[in-house]
Amino acid sequence: MKLPEPMNTITNLIDQYHKAQSERPRPHMGCSALGHPCDRWLWLNFRWAVVEEFEGRILRLFRRGQNEEEIIVRDLRNVGIDIRSSQARVSFGSHVSGSLDGIIESGVPEAPTKRHVAEFKTHSKKSFDDMVKHGVEKSKPQHWVQMQVYCHGTDIDRALYVAVCKDDDRLHIERVRYDADVATRAVARGQRIALADRMPEPLSADPSWYQCRFCAAHSLCHKAAPTKQANCRTCAHSTALADSTWRCERHDADDIPVDFQHTGCDDHIIHPDLVPWPMIPSEDGHSVMWRIGDRVIENGANGYKSREILANPDVCGTDEVEEMKRIFPDAEVIG
C-alpha cells in the first residue's frame, strides 16, 4: 500500500479545518455589497437562498486579507497617521449596515487635520495592476460605493483606500471624495431590495453574460434550478421589516432570532420565486402544492418538509417514497 504524501495530508487537514470553521451568512444587507451590479443577487444573498461554499484554500485567502488589516494599521500609525475605531459600525435601518476598517482622525499628508474613512483591500497582481491604471472608482466600483456609504454613515467627506498586492506587497493608496448622491442612492437601493417580498429582475437575461457566467446564483437564476437552502428567509411565511427584524406570519411571531432563522421550523414553505415549479396554494395558507413533473407534492407541516423537497425533488411523491413513509412515518428524504 502506498503511503499518503504527508504534506498533502497536512494541507488537506488544514483546509478541512477552515471549511469546518466557515462563518454563517451575515444577517444584514452589508454595505460592502451595495455596489454589486445585480439586484437579484443582492436579494438572493440577503435571503440566504444562495449560500456560497468556499474550499479551504479560498478561506485561507480570506484570512490573509483579514490579517493584512492589522499590518496596514500598524504601518499607518508608524508614519504618524492617527487611526482609530477599528470595525466601527454604521446602520441605516431596513437591514442595511456595515463595519468600517477604521476611522482616521488626522495625519494624512495631503490633509493632515482631515478625518477619513479607512478601507483596506488585498488584490491579486492582475487586479492590483488594473486598479493602479484606472483608479478604484473605475476598477473596483463595489469598493468605491462601499466607501461612499461609509462616508455617508459617519459624516466624513473623505476616505483613504489602501490596497496591497498579495504577489509582491506593492501598495496603492488613494484618497476618495464623498459623493452624497451615490451614497444615498446605494443605501436606498439596499433598503428597497432587503424589504422586497418578491425576487427582483436579474442584471441580464443572458446566461452567458460575463457578470452572470460565474455567479453562485447562475443555476437558480438561469437554469431553473431550485434553491438548496431551507431557512426562515427562504420561507414564504417570513417578511423582512423596516425595523431590521423578521416576522413570521405562520406563527404570528415578530423579531425572529437570527440563530433560529438559520434552520427555521417544519412549517416552512418554499418561497415561490425560489423554485421553478407551478404552485397550487391551499385555502388555509399553511401549505402549498407543487407540480413537479407528473406529480403534485404537498409542502408544509402535513406534507413533505421543504428540506426534503429541496434535497431531492425527483423522488418526493413517488410510489416508493410514499410506501416508505407509510411504513416509517418519521422517515425523511435526505438526498
Language model regions located:
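Metal-dependent nuclease catalytic cores that hydrolyze phosphodiester bonds in DNA/RNA
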Residues: M1-V117, S124-K126, H134-E137, E283, ...
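A generic structural signal for residues located within well-ordered alpha-helices
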Residues: E68, Q142-V145
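Glutamine-centric residue-chemistry signal
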Residues: Q87, Q146-Q148
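A generic structural motif
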Residues: E105-G107, V164, E249-H251
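Internal, hydrophobic cores of structured domains that mediate oligomerization or house catalytic pockets
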Residues: E110-V117, K121, Q142, C151, ...
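A short beta-strand motif that forms part of the nucleic acid-binding face
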Residues: T122-S124, C165-K166, D252
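Metal-dependent nuclease catalytic regions and adjoining charged, substrate-binding loops involved
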Residues: D130, E137-Q142, V149, G153-R247, ...
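Short linker/helix segments within small regulatory modules
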Residues: A253-D259
